[in-house]
Amino acid sequence: MSPFAPLASGILLLLWLTAPSRACTCVPPHPQTAFCSSDLVIRAKFVGAPEFNQTASYKRYEIKMTKMFKGFNALGDAPDIRFIYTPAMESVCGYFHRSQNRSQEFLIAGQLWNGHLHITTCSFVAPWNSLSSAQRQGFTEIYAAGCEECTVFPCTSIPCKLQSDTHCLWTDQLLTGSDKGFQSRHLACMPREPGMCTWQSLRPRVA
């Protein structure tokens, strides 16, 4: 597991507990980072309006899961995920689902707490059809192979310096001002040899 995963989880929890007067801010992760740092990664449809708990501290969305990419062991004996939980207010990183299309599938990466799937506005949630073919391949079968040894290392300002040979420098934000650049949409940080990771293309090979 990436050494940054516990830190990321801690930051996420801190954001969750932040007072409502402070806005929630976060840097979108590379999709491989989202996969590796999440307990559950699924494809699902949002099929119900949000339901609020009695104190309105959190809400839940009913979903219909169509595919699981990660989390078989974490889920245990539970046959399915029917709800996603999130803070009720966007100011404390609550996720707000804007699409009204209940047949649209989404890639959802979240944390499993007390047997429930939790997400925030900082979580990786994206329409499945908005992902590149390389990203879909990554979530389906490739990203998992890089989780143990490799780390996507964000570079947001110059100078950038890798801290380990197992890091891949992610420069999309720096070069394009977007987290949806070429490295995010087409590359994965994968082991090349023991103790070394490099960017590898996930673009479909032409026969």
Curated annotation (Swiss-Prot):
GO terms under biological process: cellular response to UV-A; negative regulation of catalytic activity; negative regulation of endopeptidase activity; negative regulation of membrane protein ectodomain proteolysis; positive regulation of cell population proliferation; regulation of integrin-mediated signaling pathway; response to cytokine; response to hormone
Pfam families listed in its UniProt record: TIMP
PTM description: The activity of TIMP1 is dependent on the presence of disulfide bonds.
One Gene Ontology cellular component annotation held by this UniProt entry: extracellular matrix
Annotated InterPro entries: Netrin_domain (IPR001134), TIMP (IPR001820), TIMP-like_OB-fold (IPR008993), TIMP_C (IPR027465), TIMP_CS (IPR030490)
Gene3D superfamilies tied to this protein: 2.40.50.120, Tissue inhibitor of metalloproteinase-1. Chain B, domain 1
Binding-site positions, Zn(2+): 24
Disulfide bonding pattern of the chain: 24-93, 26-122, 36-147, 150-197, 155-160, 168-189
Family: Belongs to the protease inhibitor I35 (TIMP) family.
Record's protein name: Metalloproteinase inhibitor 1
Taxonomic source organism: Sus scrofa
Gene that produces this protein: TIMP1
